[in-house]
Amino acid sequence: MSNPSCIIIAITGASASGKSSIASTVHKELCNELGCQEIGIITEDSYYKDQSHLEMTERVKTNYDHPNSMDRDLLIQHLKNLKNGSAVDVPVYSYVEHTRTNETTHFTPKRIVILEGILLLTDERVRQLADISVFVDTPLDICFIRRLQRDMEERGRSLQSVIDQYRATVRPMFLQFIEPSKQYADIVIPRGGKNRIAINMLKAQILHLLNQK
């Protein structure tokens, strides 16, 4: 069944910039206003490439901040399917095994799909499919502190490993790919999830688009 009223919101920015917080806030508040059956979140992380054919020694070398780590074709196909009113089975990625699991998450068509990830606007096809593109513009030092706390507390990583990864891939890839993609955003949100005015503006624009469909 066609779903011409499906609106895709792409929310991007640096790792730990507050993307997930904004996506979660918008999702929760629109759930209350429209009903949770009308809105869903898909994370770009789910579309990292399957690496089950590689040995673990090769998998751990993955640069998760480079566009080549993503299965873009599958993501684009899923977005098109949702636009056309078809359900999709979103992959489940394991950072422990550095590859996809055998499980998927069944995602039914929604009026609003929030897509969240660091590399979204680096792909022209995603930009064309997104009805609203958002860049969360948070200073890199703040992002690093948040990432450091998160990875040590939630993922059991050492201080040195987080610092090494930040220097080797996170910061260089942000400067090379993510920051330049800000030019494609319709809305730039400073201060991340604490910017209440910007979140209200984003919600208002989403509701405006819904009324136009």
UniProtKB/Swiss-Prot annotation:
One of its GO terms (biological process) is CTP salvage. CDD domains: UMPK (cd02023). The keyword Kinase applies. Signal peptide: none annotated. Gene3D superfamilies: P-loop containing nucleotide triphosphate hydrolases. Keywords: ATP-binding, Cytoplasm, Kinase, Nucleotide-binding, Transferase. It is found in: Cytoplasm. It is an enzyme of class 2 (transferase). One of its GO terms (cellular component) is cytoplasm. ATP binds at G13, A14, S15, A16, S17, G18, K19, S20. It comes from the Bacteria. The keyword Methyltransferase does not apply. This is Uridine kinase.
